[in-house]
Amino acid sequence: MKRAEKREHLIDVATRLFNRLGYHAAGIDQVIAEAGLAKTTLYRHFKSKEDLIVAVLRRLDEKYRDAMRQTVDKLAQEPHAKLLATFDFLENWFKNDAFYGCPFMSAAGEYGERPNPILQEAVVHKRLMIAYFEELARAANLQEPHRIAEEINLLHEGATAVAHVTGDADTAR
């Protein structure tokens, strides 16, 4: 495996473990054991567990936002319909076997006591989501697009939390 492939493999394995077990509960030893790599390899790519978590969150942010955009663009053409299609995306995500709630809220919950790079990544993701919802609200010519974007974000957050706790994907409807 090439150097870049090892880094990506570590991020993939860490993503699965952190989502399933939690950021604190999943240890570095578990990550390297499941990845089948040496601890020195991990530390060649990441200075600390926190750096690995930041890399995981960045990857998740990129994948999540790309997947939502693709789904929304595929399902809807009209601006108003695109706003509603964001909830169809959520429903599909909730039905995925790898759905364990919002990884950004989990990270913020586990590392949010003080300002740090992990909390910062969670905040960046939430702000980027609000910006996307605002973009959709502006395209739909809605009044107060930022306020509407924040409200849509709250609906998404609530639906995600309820789906995680209850296992009911219909909370996105």
Question: What residues fall within each predicted segment?
Answer:
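Generic hydrophobic, amphipathic alpha-helix propensity
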Residues: K6-T15, V31, V56-L60, Y64, ...
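Hydrophobic alpha-helical connector segments
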Residues: A55, R69-N96, A139, A149-I152
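Helix-turn-helix
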Residues: H9, R16-D51, A55
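Amphipathic alpha-helical segments used for helix-helix packing
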Residues: N96-N116, Q120
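Amphipathic alpha-helical packing segments from all-alpha helical-bundle domains
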Residues: E62-R65, A81, R114-A139, E150
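N-terminal intrinsically disordered/low-complexity leader segments
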Residues: M1-E5
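Hydrophobic/aromatic-rich alpha-helical bundle segments in the mid-to-C-terminal region
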Residues: I118-V124, A139-R173
